[in-house]
Amino acid sequence: MWDPLVNDFPKSLHGFRCMLAIKYLQYIQENYPSNSLGFVYLTELIQVLRIRKHAKAELRYRLLYPDVECAEEADLRHPAFLTCHCGKCPCQREKEEVDQPTHVEETEILSVIPLS
């Protein structure tokens, strides 16, 4: 856990509360398998807490909240079948590599020349 004597304190009380919330969520996250729906939701919630702009965090939380509310408690430990479009996830990169056949080359995008 976080040691206040070794690490710097956040500059505001709100930052301190967010930091404690993130540490608590990371602790809970250890109890879920890494491919489960609960793990995905906890990861997204941690990302929301790390956002510095209030409006953006509020939007992301409002998008996440209905999914978490509708999820059954038993489903949180089962593997997640969510499609991620962020491009950062390893499973997304693997899928992109599999989708393109090896014998097909990429074509160049040609610019449109206007007729005058």
UniProtKB/Swiss-Prot annotation:
Keywords: Host cytoplasm, Host-virus interaction, Inhibition of host innate immune response by virus, Suppressor of RNA silencing, Viral immunoevasion. Disulfide bonds: none annotated. It is found in: Host cytoplasm, Host perinuclear region. The keyword NAD does not apply. GO terms for cellular component: host cell perinuclear region of cytoplasm. Through its interaction with host SGS3, acts as a suppressor of RNA-mediated gene silencing, also known as post-transcriptional gene silencing (PTGS), a mechanism of plant viral defense that limits the accumulation of viral RNAs. Belongs to the geminiviridae protein AV2/V2 family. Interacts with host SGS3. This is Protein AV2. It comes from Mungbean yellow mosaic virus (strain Vigna).
